[in-house]
Swiss-Prot record:
The lineage of its organism: Bacteria, Pseudomonadati, Thermodesulfobacteriota, Desulfuromonadia, Desulfuromonadales. GO terms for biological process: arginine biosynthetic process via ornithine; L-arginine biosynthetic process. The record marks K29, K250 as: Transition state stabilizer. The keyword Transcription does not apply. CDD domains: AAK_NAGK-C. It is an enzyme of class 2 (transferase). GO terms for cellular component: cytoplasm. This is Acetylglutamate kinase. Pathway: Amino-acid biosynthesis; L-arginine biosynthesis; N(2)-acetyl-L-ornithine from L-glutamate: step 2/4. Signal peptide: none annotated. Belongs to the acetylglutamate kinase family. ArgB subfamily. The gene is argB. The keyword ATP-binding applies.
């Protein structure tokens, strides 16, 4: 009986959040270990289907770095990285597009639909969903001077075709976006999935941007998980080098999205089963909530 009462209490805890978020849009970046572990894949799919059943509009943007690395290795192509971004020549771009659009996207769509979803796979080239431009990366040399490095076919999002996403939403479909953009001449661009998720969330004026990662969330200098943090404090932690490495572009992506109208951003541990539901529908959450 006690377990049944506990389940009822859990439902009651979620009720205010269910009421608050019905009809809102969540953009979720799906990546990391959650994409490779079978149990976590099922857990993620069920979380997303639950959101949809509660009247929450979900848009998924997925990564695929490990799958790209495996395929490039199979073809004998060696990649260079600048600030964590892959320098992408035409040969590499062909592999990136093949893997992200033709393999990973279809897998994500497949297991969402297997669990009762109405997922539709898209790349940024479909309906010019992600109009893009070449990204030039600023790199500081040993002498302190800054130069711009041509990353090849690495892009940034110029415009999101929200009409396409809203049409899918109106048809009760679940968009699943591969982070491949299209340039003005029809060229393909490899775009960081976190960046795409942030741009899509801003364009849709989303209630939440949620990034699934392979760590617990944002931590302070003592290594303690921060359940909530303001953008100003986030910048301070970067200056203090409490936030370093690959976490910096993630928190900056969240800050940019908040600046452009997204209500809240979350960085959560995708290695935890039902991470999305636990973060959104419990009082404590399991990751870090970032707000202005």
């Amino acid at each position: 009986m006690e377990k049944l009462i506990e389940k009822a209490n859990n439902l009651m805890e979620a009720l205010p959040y269910i009421r608050r978020f019905a009809g809102k849009t969540f953009v979720i970046k799906y990546g990391g270990h959650a994409m490779s572990d079978e149990k976590l894949k099922e857990s993620f799919a069920l979380d997303v289907i639950m959101l949809r059943s509660l009247g929450i509009n979900a848009v998924i943007v997925h990564g695929g770095g490990p799958q790209i690395n495996q395929t490039l290795k199979r073809y004998g192509i060696v990649s260079q990285f600048v600030k964590g971004m892959r320098v992408t020549d035409s040969e590499t771009m062909a592999v990136v597009e093949m893997v992200l659009v033709g393999q990973v996207n279809k897998e994500v769509v497949g297991y969402l639909n297997q669990h009762g979803g109405r997922a539709v796979g898209l790349s940024g080239k479909d309906g010019t969903l992600l109009l893009s431009k070449k990204l030039l990366q600023d790199v500081v040399g040993d002498d302190g001077t800054t130069e711009q490095v041509d990353m090849g076919y690495v892009g940034d999002v110029v415009k999101v075709n929200t009409d396409l996403l809203k049409a899918l939403e109106n048809g009760n479909y679940l968009p699943v976006i591969a982070p491949v953009g299209v340039g003005p001449q029809g060229e393909s661009y490899n775009i960081n999935a976190d960046l795409v998720a942030g741009r899509v969330a801003a364009a849709l004026n989303a209630e939440k941007l949620i990034l699934l990662t392979d760590i617990e969330g944002v931590k302070d200098k003592a290594g303690q998980l921060l359940s909530s943090i303001a953008v100003a404090d986030m910048h301070r932690l970067i200056r203090e080098e409490a936030i370093t490495g690959g976490m910096i572009p993630k928190v900056v992506c969240c800050a940019d999205a908040l600046e452009e109208g997204v209500k809240k951003a979350h960085i959560i541990d995708g290695r935890v089963e039902h991470a999305v539901l636990l973060e959104i529908f419990t009082d404590v959450g399991i990751g870090t909530e970032i707000q202005k």
